[in-house]
Structure formats: C-alpha cells, structure tokens
Amino acid sequence: REAGLDHILTSFPSIDKKENDYIMQSNNSLEKIMRGIKACVRNGIRISANMVILRANMDKIYDTGKLAASLGCDKFFITRAVPPSYSETSKSDNSTEDLYNLTHEETKKCLDEVLRIKKDFKMRVGSLVSYPLCFLEDLDKYRDFVGRGCPSQSGHRMSINANGDLHVCVHEEESYGNVFKTSIQEVYQNEMRTWHNKSKRYSGCKGCEYIEMCESGCQMISAAVNGETATKDPLYVGPNNVKKDFNLVDDKGIYDVIKKNEKFKVRNTLRFRQEKGFILVNIRWGNTISV
C-alpha cells in the first residue's frame, strides 16, 4: 500500500478445497487465497477475484462468488479457459468431453450464475477473456461482458516475460523479441502489427456491425481449438446475430453541464501514449481507448 498499489487481481478457482488445490497445483491454496484477500481488505487495497471456468468447477460459480463477496472482494470475474497449445482440445463446438470448451448452453448458464451473484451480493462482475457478441445475443442483459473485445487486437496490450521475451497476449507462446535486446517501441510498431491490422479477425465475421467491438472473440482460444488464429471462436454463432443491442447510459446531467459551458476536470491519473496515426488514452485501470 505504501508503494502506491491500489488494486490486486487474484485467482479464485473454486470454493472446493481439493479442486482448488488441483487447479492451482498448490497445497492449501484456498486458505492462502482467503488470507491474501483479507490482508488486502485490511490495508485498503481493492481486490478482484478471477474464476477461470472449466467443466470441473462450473457448478460452483455461485458459491465461489458468494465467498469472494463475503471476504470483501470488489469484483468477481468469470473467465473463459484458454487451452494450452499442448492440450488435446476438441474440434467440436459442443463437445461434452472437452475440459476447457463448454457448450453454448453451459456457458450461458455460467454467465447467468454470475449475474445472480451481481444481484444477490451487489458485486461488480465481468470477464478477462471476451465472448463473441453474436453468442451473447442479448447485449443489454449481458452488458457486463460486453466492450472488452480483444485488447491484443486493439493494440492495448504487450506482455513481458520474466526473461524479457515479448508477447502480445499473455496466452501466446510466440515471442516477438526480447526487452534486453530489442526496443519495445520497435517490436510494438513492427513485429506485433499483425495483431493490430485486423488480420486476426475470422472471415465469417465480415459485415457484422459489432466487429470493431468484438474482434471475433478470443483468437487464442480459436488457435488452441483450430490450430491457428483468424479462425472461428468455439462460441461463434454468426454475423449480426445480436437480438438486443447494448444500451448506452444516457446521463442528462452531463448534457446540462455541456449546455451551461461549465468546465470539465480531467483526472490527474489519465495517461496518453502517442502511436502512429492515433493516440491511446488510459482512462483508469484496464480501460484504454484509441483516439
């Protein structure tokens, strides 16, 4: 806290002790997670819990979220599992034997459980890995899972390994350079451009009005399932399958302030980064937009 840390994201795989140990590959992991959360709360540090959903723990979402809320977590993320490249993932969209890829119906049930957590415990919810918007269909109901898109394709992300290797997505094996040998700017502007020039989008998404926000779901999951990026996300349904659009918050008070020519104050934590042809603006936490 004294160093300026104001937020921590922790993994919280399951309320079940044995299951939690198996997923984390660590003994007494649940107790350690709970102890860490309590320490953060005591010291005034915001903490969010992230539950990666597998077929093994999907039935414990509500109880795990309930525990996270009782411990003082600010937000509960339900995140799609990204299969490792060495795993034997199923090529079927609706396989019941696949550990990582849930069926469309199972995934919707998981999202509904998270919305129940939000309602019952007044807890903010979300996801760290995007869902294809054509799969969500009702963007107003599932608004908490809309808008993240793919930070890697948006140019908002770069991952640096402990050894200095540079990746775009945290789930990616390919290295584009090394921070100890190459300029970060050079790697970002040149080597990583294939992620930023729309070539990672699935061709079946062409013409969809939500493609700029969706970016064809998660291309690392697509790569794990199909063997390469720019392919179909397992939850893909089809372009323009959104049945209910996302409704923007219309705050009349903001328009009144504008009409009165009143001054706006910009947060001193706002950050800008000049790129080629655009500027990235980090509003707060992980919220970054291009202008």
Q: What residue spans do the PLM features occupy?
A:
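Radical SAM enzyme [4Fe-4S]-AdoMet core and its adjacent flexible, acidic
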Residues: 2-7, 11-153, 157-163, 167-171, ...
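Flexible mid-to-C-terminal extensions adjoining Fe-S/redox cofactors in radical SAM and related proteins
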Residues: 141, 165-166, 170-278, 283
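Long, charge-rich, low-complexity alpha-helical segments
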Residues: 284-291
